[in-house]
């Protein structure tokens, strides 16, 4: 059983759907996106967090995720919603697993 919050990466239509589904179940959700006005960042079911842009600076994005995860009192679950985040999480899983749970194999 995971007691940490959910971290939804990128607020596309898929991200918004995840935020709503998790939030309606009482899960605390952080919505991460480089654009404050992205779809889903204003949902009542999440706390919006503006991040570096993974496409512009992947290393900075990874550093942000590591720092954000380290600051949580319990391990959050990462929900990637796009190819760039899936690729990064797959490649950097070992480093990120110190601070996060994963929903992907």
Give the positions of each predicted feature.
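Extreme N-terminal starter segment of soluble prokaryotic enzymes
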Residues: 2-6
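Hydrophobic anchor at the start of a short beta-strand
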Residues: 26-30
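Glycine-rich adenosine-cofactor-binding loop
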Residues: 7-20
